[in-house]
């Protein structure tokens, strides 16, 4: 990352600030693992002079770079398809496709199935003058959002993009409460839920549902779950615009979980000693 940034940015001060920001969070560090995504972070940083601290804004910045800034950077003229399918509608299309596959637990898609799903979603969006095949080609070749992993076997180019677009779908349909319930029961939805929470204008109602559920189902009956503990910590540390009193509730909840874990560990030790 350090070597790449120093080669990318002519100004050493700018390179230093970028490196500091890129290494400041796990989300940005994950994106720095591949040259393409590291390039996108650099392009995004050139526009905004900052690296977003919350995961949803970070991935949105990279998606925007892929959908628009990447072509500008490479001096690629917008195709006829791009004129028919706007930046916003591409995002909507990708969010619907991502959620369909994610909810089914499918992360790798056969080309014929992917084009079928794209065609169905294009029809629902009333996009009439482009084909699913041309959309797939553009999303793969021009934008790098899909990648062919093996012969006619595709996936999103980064799992985080699949999760991000799935989160966009839940937020767009105002179903983040449903997403919260899924996240409590199924770890695969954890990142999706956290990004959805960060994308909400007011996530406090959803956060309160999680708070009460954890209190009633885990703290009061004395049931410790390490996954739920981690989820509580992630919500507390997230970039979601939570009210101060809600953050205080989650800080209290984290203490409750720690006390519960210690208490149960001590009880187990006493049983073993006995």
Listing of model-derived features with the role each one plays in the protein:
Residues 16, 47-52, 56, 60, ...:
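Extended helical regulatory/linker subdomains that flank P-loop NTPase cores
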Residues 38-41, 165-166, 196:
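Buried hydrophobic packing segments
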Residues 7-8, 44, 168:
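Residue-level signal for well-ordered alpha-helical positions
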Residues 73, 92, 98, 167-274:
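Hydrophobic repeat-domain scaffold segments
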Residues 2-40, 61, 134-135:
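Amphipathic alpha-helical segments of the small helical/lid subdomains adjacent to P-loop NTPase cores
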Residues 21-26, 79-84, 132, 149, ...:
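Active-site-adjacent structural elements in folded domains
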Residues 1, 34, 97, 196:
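A residue-level signal for conserved active-site and pocket-lining positions in enzyme catalytic cores
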Residues 23-33, 50-51, 83-92, 156, ...:
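Structural motif
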């Amino acid at each position: 990352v350090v070597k790449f940034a120093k080669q990318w940015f002519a100004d050493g001060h700018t390179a230093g600030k970028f490196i500091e920001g890129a290494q400041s969070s796990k989300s940005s560090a994950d994106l720095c693992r591949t040259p393409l995504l590291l390039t996108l972070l650099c392009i995004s940083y050139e526009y905004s002079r900052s690296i977003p601290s919350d995961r949803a804004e970070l991935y949105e910045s990279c998606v925007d770079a892929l959908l628009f800034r990447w072509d500008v950077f490479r001096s690629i003229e917008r195709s006829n398809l791009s004129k028919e399918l706007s930046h916003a509608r591409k995002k909507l299309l990708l969010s619907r496709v991502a959620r369909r596959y994610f909810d089914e637990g499918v992360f790798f898609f056969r080309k014929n199935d992917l084009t079928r799903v794209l065609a169905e979603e294009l029809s629902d969006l009333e996009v009439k003058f482009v084909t699913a095949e041309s959309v797939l080609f553009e999303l793969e070749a021009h934008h790098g959002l899909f990648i062919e992993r093996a012969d006619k076997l595709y996936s999103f180019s980064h799992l985080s993009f699949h999760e991000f677009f799935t989160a966009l779908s839940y937020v767009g349909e105002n179903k983040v409460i449903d997403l919260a319930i899924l996240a409590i029961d199924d770890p695969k939805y954890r990142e999706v839920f956290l990004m959805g929470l960060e994308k909400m204008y007011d996530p406090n109602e959803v956060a309160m549902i999680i708070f009460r559920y954890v209190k009633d189902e885990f703290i009061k009956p004395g049931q410790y779950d390490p996954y739920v503990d981690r989820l509580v910590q992630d919500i507390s540390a997230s970039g979601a615009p939570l009210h101060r009193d809600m953050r205080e509730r989650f800080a209290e909840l984290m203490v409750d979980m720690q006390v519960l874990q210690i208490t149960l560990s001590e009880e187990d030790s006493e049983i073993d000693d006995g």
